[in-house]
Amino acid sequence: MESADFYEAEPRPPMSSHLQSPPHAPSSAAFGFPRGAGPAQPPAPPAAPEPLGGICEHETSIDISAYIDPAAFNDEFLADLFQHSRQQEKAKAAVGPTGGGGGGDFDYPGAPAGPGGAVMPGGAHGPPPGYGCAAAGYLDGRLEPLYERVGAPALRPLVIKQEPREEDEAKQLALAGLFPYQPPPPPPPSHPHPHPPPAHLAAPHLQFQIAHCGQTTMHLQPGHPTPPPTPVPSPHPAPALGAAGLPGPGSALKGLGAAHPDLRASGGSGAGKAKKSVDKNSNEYRVRRERNNIAVRKSRDKAKQRNVETQQKVLELTSDNDRLRKRVEQLSRELDTLRGIFRQLPESSLVKAMGNCA
């Protein structure tokens, strides 16, 4: 594809080729100006295009900024590299230093020196006025969108990992020690508790479970004055529950109460109030208490019956032992008598008796 089909002037060489061209060769053809033309000379007819080079000769001069995703420029080294190349392009595009024939790529021999020794465009062999502005604008227009997409490395959003606080870790450890896996599901419909606590007290699921566990352990202990094995519970268990903070002597519950003072205060008071209301106004609690009492009485009756049976067996075995001892004593006496009789008999009679037996 030849560029002469689209431009009336000579084809524009790549940016890298005209930036690295020797000082004596003017590069105004890159912007469409014919070579050797001055402001007073008429424009020359379009010259024949220069022969193109190899296929991959100017491969590095292709502008691929429009095809590169801006999200790919996330490396600070790449951004610094583009920033450095941009500064070099701007420095080359600017007017060269003092000297009138400088050595820069955009210096033109024979151009008049302006104030401060700067070479002014529009000399005998230079481009028309405004060339420096056009070149600077061209380079800025070609390079600015790329750096606008890249952005400053210091302004990029940084993803900062937040470390958990010590309080959160302590809470998680305490909960993990209590319940190995305790998801927060909604309360089941068929709950054994007849009257759940109010809405402001039933919000924390853990408080509800702790109160229910404490109530269950207290319900399993009857308060009737029956023989020794089970202790009688206190008539007012709610104040003890509030003072202790959490029911149960376990170290995990104590650690949880120490880690959550607000939970300890609210849970103790709420559970005590709920239990008082249940003890006074719940028929289901009374029925359950009666069933527990009946079961305890049955178990105690069975224990008493086993004790009586054991005592009877002990008495029977004792009597048998006495009878056997008496039998042993009787047989011992008979043996001693027989031994005495045999000792009193003479030896001759014994020999005769043995001969008769033989």
Curated annotation (Swiss-Prot):
Region (Required for interaction with TRIB1): 54-72
Coiled coil: none
Consequence the record notes for mutating H58D: No effect on interaction with TRIB1
Sequence ranges of Pro residues compositional bias: 40-49, 181-199, 224-238
Annotated region (Required to induce adipocyte differentiation), positions in chain: 128-204
Residue positions, PTM Phosphoserine: S190, S234
Covalent link location (Glycyl lysine isopeptide (Lys-Gly) (interchain with G-Cter in SUMO2)): K161
Compositionally biased spans, kind Low complexity: 29-39, 239-259
Spans annotated as Basic motif: 286-313
Basic and acidic residues: compositionally biased ranges: 276-291
Modified residues (Phosphothreonine): T226, T230
Disordered, as annotated region: 1-55, 178-201, 217-291
Post-translational modification, as annotated: Phosphorylation at Ser-190 is required for interaction with CDK2, CDK4 and SWI/SNF complex leading to cell cycle inhibition. Dephosphorylated at Ser-190 by protein phosphatase 2A (PP2A) through PI3K/AKT signaling pathway regulation. Phosphorylation at Thr-226 and Thr-230 by GSK3 is constitutive in adipose tissue and lung. In liver, both Thr-226 and Thr-230 are phosphorylated only during feeding but not during fasting. Phosphorylation of the GSK3 consensus sites selectively decreases transactivation activity on IRE-controlled promoters. Sumoylated, sumoylation blocks the inhibitory effect on cell proliferation by disrupting the interaction with SMARCA2.
Quaternary assembly: Binds DNA as a homodimer and as a heterodimer. Can form stable heterodimers with CEBPB, CEBPD, CEBPE and CEBPG. Interacts with PRDM16. Interacts with UBN1. Interacts with ZNF638; this interaction increases transcriptional activation. Interacts with the complex TFDP2:E2F1; the interaction prevents CEBPA binding to target gene promoters and represses its transcriptional activity. Interacts with RB1. Interacts (when phosphorylated at Ser-190) with CDK2, CDK4, E2F4 and SMARCA2. Interacts with SREBPF1. (Microbial infection) Interacts with HBV protein X.
Illness association: Leukemia, acute myelogenous: A subtype of acute leukemia, a cancer of the white blood cells. AML is a malignant disease of bone marrow characterized by maturational arrest of hematopoietic precursors at an early stage of development. Clonal expansion of myeloid blasts occurs in bone marrow, blood, and other tissue. Myelogenous leukemias develop from changes in cells that normally produce neutrophils, basophils, eosinophils and monocytes.
Protein family according to the UniProt entry: Belongs to the bZIP family. C/EBP subfamily.
Protein name per its UniProtKB record: CCAAT/enhancer-binding protein alpha
Phylogenetic lineage: Eukaryota, Metazoa, Chordata, Craniata, Vertebrata
